[in-house]
Every structure is written in C-alpha cells, then in structure tokens.
C-alpha cells in the first residue's frame, strides 16, 4: 500500500524518502515509542488510538529524523490531533511532544525502559520494540546474548543487498569497483552488503546504470549468503525452486550457471520473472503455478529448493509490520504447512537427489526441528549441510538452511 501511494506522480523524491523512513521506522520502534508516550500521559487509556498513532509517529520524527526540525514535527502533529480530537487533545499533544523534544537523550538511555522494576522480558520488549511472545521465545531458544542480538537487529534497517551478475562479462571488474565503496559491510562474490540508504549513484560507480543493464540486482545479502553457505554451486541439476516467489533465488541460481525451473502457488509473484531474465541476459526460465504441497513433476529434479513460507522472524528489520501482525497461534499452521511441503519434496526426489530447506525465521520449531521431524520419518535421509539462523551484524537478517540427500 505504501509503495503504491508513493508511486503516484508529482511526489518530491525527498518527501517519498521521508515517508518511507517514517513508516518503516515507526513500525520498527512502535513498542518503544508507545512506552515513551505512555510515560508522559496522565491517563494513556483515555487517548484515542488515532491520536496515539499521531503522537508516536511525531515522537519518532523528533527522536530519529535529525534533518527535520523538532518544531516542525510538533506543529504538524498538533494540527493533526486538533482536526481529529479537538483543542483539548491538541493541547495535550503539544505538551507531550515538547517534553520529548526538550530532552531527546533521555529516551536513548536503556534505563528509561527499566522503570517500575520491570522484569527482564518486559524491559527487552519495551526497549527493543518487540512483542513479548517473540522476545520470550528467543530468550528460551537462543539464550540471552543471542536473543538480544536478534532483538537489536530488528530495530535497524537492513543493509542494501546487491548481487553482481556472475553470468555477464565484466562481473569481477564491477565487483572489485564496488568493494571500494565506503562502509562496505560484506563483500563475498557475487554478494555485497552496503549500509541502508546508500546512494546508488556515487561518483565513479554508476550503480543505476549497472542495474538497468542487468549487471547488478537488488537482493537481500543474507538470502544470498545462505545459498552460498549451503553449497548451491554443487547442487545436482536441474534445480526446482518450488516456492520461488518473485524469483530472487531462482535468478541467483541461474546467474551461477545452474539449470533451474520455478513454481509458486501465486502466479502473480512469478509475473516479472520473464522481464528479469531478459534484463539479466539469461536464458528463459520455465515457471508455472503450483502448490509445493503437491509436486506433480514429470521428471524428478536433481535438487528441490524449498524456500518455505514461515513466520519471517529473521527478517523483521525488512518487514517490521510482521511482528505486530503475527500471533503465537499462527505458528502451528505454518509448521503443518512446512511439514506437508517437506514430505511432498521428499516424495518428488529421485535417489541421489538433494532437498534444500530454507526459511527466514528464528524459530527452531520451523527450522532444525522441522528437519529432524522429516529425518525421523525417513531415516535414510542424510543431512549434508546446515546453516543456523544466527545473528550476523553485517547481514542484519537471519536465515536457516539445510541440505538433505535422499540415498
């Protein structure tokens, strides 16, 4: 919805950038902002939801948007509250936001969120702006240090991930040129991770031209790295990407020289694959609509890549709305779906084939335990490689992956 609204003609690029930062930043830090505002209100429960949203959005702008003067944030927010809830609420909004603007450093101090002698879980939930059930699950499954690393990662925008097209002449030269950019977070051919918000047209390296010419693509660096760590160049061919989505991993495989074909339950997601293969100068990739729970393939592929639907808890920095939409009760249905997909993939493989299971979540029940459950039902399966969903400061996101061989 945001992308569609911002695609309208006539919007100043600066306004488009600010709107994007406000929406994503607010979603990442909503819990922290709501706690700040609640501490400054006499009766938080009496404040209408719409007014609370205005207050927390303005608080984000005051605290985290250095280029916007605090008085401007206070002004538009008070005007918005007056229109929605009258003069009384507007006066309250003015007082609250001026207090925030007067002492912004106070809200950067973790001790502010430890008030009321709260338990550690409540502090972590407040400070890292994460629903308690997610924080509790990570504390239980990962230990405090790793849980805190995951919590911290989801409060920051993810790095800009780029993939150099290894199938094109000049790929190594372009990669070498890009590694000279400042503040590179990761450079592992063909993958680069740059700081979020990196200008794509710096002097000397015309990234926009490289994108247009098919020498370069945007793709999560963490999504690329998990495939590399799982040894994708050694996977038997052809590779069937059974949950291809928009085809990011499909195209990465094709650029690496793999024979690949793709499917997804939602045909619309695959609609841009033809344009992308043309931009990248790749041979056409067969793609069709199909459910990964029923793989009716004419011939068994060498490898089935199952990038399974999951809770997405490893990519909350990129999809911060997910943490507010997800509920603990969602997990059981996802685990059942993953089990059905794994069984279908196992059945579709010929002896000697590989099943590659990938998720973008931090939840052992969807990751290691899903693989263990499949292995307990098919004891002949061999686990050849496994990548845990561990925090990685350079990548800012966490993916799990496993390679299973069917003897």
Where are these regions (language model features)?
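Glycine-rich S-adenosyl-L-methionine
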Residues: 136, 265-274, 322-349
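C-terminal catalytic and target-recognition region of SAM-dependent MTase-like enzymes
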Residues: 209, 213, 219, 290-305, ...
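Conserved class I S-adenosyl-L-methionine
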Residues: 235-243
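Class I SAM-dependent methyltransferase "Motif I" SAM/SAH-binding loop
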Residues: 243-247, 310
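Conserved SAM-binding loop of SAM-dependent methyltransferases across substrates and taxa
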Residues: 246-257
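Conserved SAM-binding motif I beta-strand of class I
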Residues: 259-264
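S-adenosyl-L-methionine
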Residues: 266-298
